[in-house]
A protein has these predicted regions:
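Bacterial N-terminal signal peptides that target proteins for export
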Residues: 2-11
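Compact, glycine-rich, soluble single-domain proteins
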Residues: 26-164
Length: 164
């Protein structure tokens, strides 16, 4: 038989595990939207730009639009579309925002549309997280503390790269 002390230790440990998994789950539910897999790419060398990535699922009955993204660590924060033309990667600001259809998912990931942080106002090299504000047409705004991660992009590193 287990004593009350053993039972309380088990319950306490179980609660701690649940709370820990919540904080590292990288999933946030917000007004019918599920935000997951969010991260900021670690800055390489003396680069003054970086990218942000997120998966947004719209569980609502109506379409939603991600209008804009804001940060306090870059002078410009934009939603970008990326296309390859004649072996050259071309990125363009998506001024009208991005539509997230009802019951569908938006993936802002490496090698596709993404968030661009341009002209960084502080070094992110020794920082583990940064707050980023997402502005939606219907749901309003939410601030997410996004981890800064050294992930390798899947894109071909030999491709040329230019903005606009």
């Amino acid at each position: 038989m287990y004593s009350l002390k053993h039972l309380l230790n088990f319950v306490f440990s179980f609660i701690i595990i649940l709370l820990s998994s919540q904080s590292f789950s990288e999933t946030i539910s917000f007004k019918g939207l599920v935000l997951s897999d969010f991260w900021i790419k670690k800055v390489i060398a003396n680069n003054n730009t970086t990218s942000g990535h997120i998966r947004i699922e719209n569980k609502n009955e109506k379409n939603e639009r991600l209008i804009s993204v804001e940060s306090d660590f870059s002078k410009i924060t934009e939603l970008h579309d990326m296309k390859i033309k004649n072996d050259i990667m071309i990125m363009k600001h998506i001024e009208e925002g991005v539509l997230i259809k009802s019951k569908s998912q938006l993936n802002l990931m490496p090698g596709s549309s993404h968030i661009m942080f341009i002209d960084l106002t502080k070094s992110l090299k020794k920082i583990k997280n940064q707050k980023v504000k997402f502005n939606f047409e219907k749901a309003g705004s939410i601030v997410i503390n996004m981890p800064i991660i050294n992930k390798t992009e899947k894109s071909n590193k030999k491709k040329k790269h230019r903005h606009h």
